[in-house]
Amino acid sequence: HTLVARLTNHSDPVHKVTIIPRGQALGYTLQLPLEDKFLTSKSELLDKLCILLAGRAAEEIVFGEITSGASDDLNKTMAYARKMVVELGMSEKLGPIALPNGDDGEVFLGRDLSRHKTYSEELARTIDEEILDLIKSSYARAKEIISSHRVAFDKLVETLLAKEVVDAKEIDEILGLKPVAKEDASPKPAEQEPV
């Protein structure tokens, strides 16, 4: 995740990566935004999909085998891709539409049986195709980034195995990148209006 997160243009800066397990995660990449965000662009969401799929892509590239380790990332990927297509109007084929998400607050087990479809089978098929296209293209992009930066990837892995935690500065050194510019964190005086 770290390599892809650092090499995509619309992702939050990577602050550190660790291989120390926490909870059900075998490690994690910590990304923090430079500022509070209220809107997310399509480019940012596409980068997020790519980053989420980077772990699975790395398994395939390095080991020629995939594991169950990416299951949470795959669930998140599907949720983001579906939201992009169905709720945010970010589908090329469907255009700027938002469809009902079907969450009407019913909590009993058979709720899916009682729902009435609000769109046709043809539209449902197009939605599925668009979601799969987003996921497949993001996966291919993640594989391409990792493959084209394999030497840096291997160096990052080697460093992580030796140190277990690597911070942003060292990540940038390994990748041969300039550090992400941090905004001035000092408080700015409020502008005063004339009274």
List PLM regions with ranges.
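Soluble catalytic regions of large protease machineries
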Residues: 2-195
